[in-house]
From Swiss-Prot:
InterPro entries: Prenylated_rab_accept_PRA1
Lineage of producing organism: Eukaryota, Viridiplantae, Streptophyta, Embryophyta, Tracheophyta
Keywords (A to Z) from UniProt: Endoplasmic reticulum, Membrane, Transmembrane, Transmembrane helix, Transport
Tissue occurrence: Expressed in roots and trichomes.
Protein family according to the UniProt entry: Belongs to the PRA1 family.
Source organism of the structure: Arabidopsis thaliana (Mouse-ear cress)
Classification via Pfam families: PRA1 (PF03208)
Name of the protein in its database record: PRA1 family protein G2
Annotated transmembrane regions: 66-86, 87-107, 119-139, 142-162
Highest taxon of the lineage: Eukaryota
Amino acid sequence: MTPSPPPITYISIPLPTNDVVSRSIHNLTTAISSHRPWSELIFSGDFSLPESFSSLLLRSKTNFNYFFVNYTIIVSTCAAFALITASPVALIVVGAIIALWLIFHFFREDPLILWSFQVGDRTVLLFLVLASVWAIWFTNSAVNLAVGVSVGLLLCIIHAVFRNSDELFLEEDDAINGGLIGSNLR
């Protein structure tokens, strides 16, 4: 009887920081490019009151899954506008913090290497949280940011509730991931 081969393990190869940044920016642009056409968001489809609470929930869920990237852009734009009206410095500082979150947390695929040392995920997360708290405290923009995000969310919720979603067709994978249809895989 021959011994079984050792299990195969996959190890990611650490990349330099500038490669992590460029890959993160590429992932961000790929994510943003998946938005639905704005004309489809605004002009196509009819707007009406839902007939029941269950149809309201289904319509909202379908619209949120279908227009998720568009809604994210709307909320971000409202938050940015609120920060511009408060202080341009606040917009720059909070924008830099958001960029740090996108690059070093959400779109990073490989371990972060700084000065030949691998930085752990907890350390990166702690740094990002502390930087975010500092930025909001430094710019006194917590109220303005909350108002901007709230207005953006309100606009998206109103659109999701009143836009009739009967003619929207999601890709099968999007519908399964969004929980709109079940999967046969168990």
